[in-house]
């Protein structure tokens, strides 16, 4: 039996041209439900959710500051101005409290990589 989150991560990685390089699922309460083994969301999950809810102008993940480029009630896209990548949060579905958090290479196009992550997130409806 395959892991639906790993499948979603693989989909985002492939569709983004290998730009999505870290992936996780968190709850609105800040609980980490799944994360790729190349990063740790536990210290920042609650802060990330607070940033989305408050539409913060910046967010910190793993001691790296990202400036918010776009924020809606269901998503946040932020870029590190020093070139440390792009952070994307997107809600799995409107009735769930589950969110995908992804990190993409600094060379990625923010809008394009957001679409790739959002599509992958939507495949997780009812699965996590």
Curated annotation (Swiss-Prot):
A cellular component term, taken from the record's GO annotations: cytoskeleton
Keyword Magnesium: no
Pfam families documented for this protein: Profilin
Localization of this protein: Cytoplasm, Cytoskeleton
Secretion signal span: none
InterPro entries named among the record's database cross-references: PFN (IPR048278), PFN_sf (IPR036140)
Keyword terms: Cytoplasm, Cytoskeleton
One GO molecular-function entry: actin binding
Similarity-based family: Belongs to the Asgard profilin family.
Known role: Has no profilin activity against rabbit actin.
Protein name: Thor profilin
Organism encoding this protein: Thorarchaeota archaeon (strain AB_25)
Lineage: Archaea, Promethearchaeati, Candidatus Thorarchaeota
């Amino acid at each position: 039996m395959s892991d639906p989150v790993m499948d979603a991560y693989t989909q985002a990685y492939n569709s983004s041209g290998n730009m999505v390089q870290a992936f996780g699922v968190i709850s609105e309460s800040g609980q980490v439900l799944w994360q790729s083994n190349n990063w740790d969301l536990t210290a920042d999950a609650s802060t990330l959710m607070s940033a989305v809810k408050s539409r913060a102008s910046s967010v910190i993940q793993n001691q790296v500051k990202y400036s918010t480029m776009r924020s809606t009630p269901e998503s946040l896209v932020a870029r590190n101005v020093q070139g440390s990548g792009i952070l994307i949060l997107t809600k799995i579905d409107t009735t769930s409290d589950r969110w995908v958090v992804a990190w993409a290479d600094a060379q990625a196009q923010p809008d394009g990589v957001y679409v790739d992550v959002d599509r992958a997130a939507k495949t997780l409806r009812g699965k996590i």
